[in-house]
Amino acid sequence: MNITKRYVVIFFLVMLTKSLSNSDVLVSSVIETSKNDVCFIPCTRRYGDWECYDDCLGKNFNDGGCVDGRCCCKK
């Protein structure tokens, strides 16, 4: 019984540590994309800044580009 409790506690500690270690990455992504109105399609080698910009203009946005691997449009 004690071994099971220890494994459960260790498991939760690992999960907590793992979730906290990614928080800096997530925050920087949110801060960077908060300057944009909408972000959607993932950017790739074939779908880059120019394609993203063109799609944003087609959706009546004034500007657009790849931000953190996603196409983001600005009004």
From Swiss-Prot:
Main location: secreted
InterPro entries, per the entry: Defensin-like_dom (IPR056373)
Compartments reported by the entry: Secreted
GO (cellular component) term, any one: extracellular region
Signal peptide: 1-23
GO biological process: defense response to fungus; killing of cells of another organism
Keywords: Antimicrobial, Disulfide bond, Fungicide, Plant defense, Secreted, Signal
SS bond list: 39-73, 43-66, 52-71, 56-72
Family per similarity comment: Belongs to the DEFL family.
Listed name of the protein: Defensin-like protein 58
Upper taxonomic lineage: Eukaryota, Viridiplantae, Streptophyta, Embryophyta, Tracheophyta
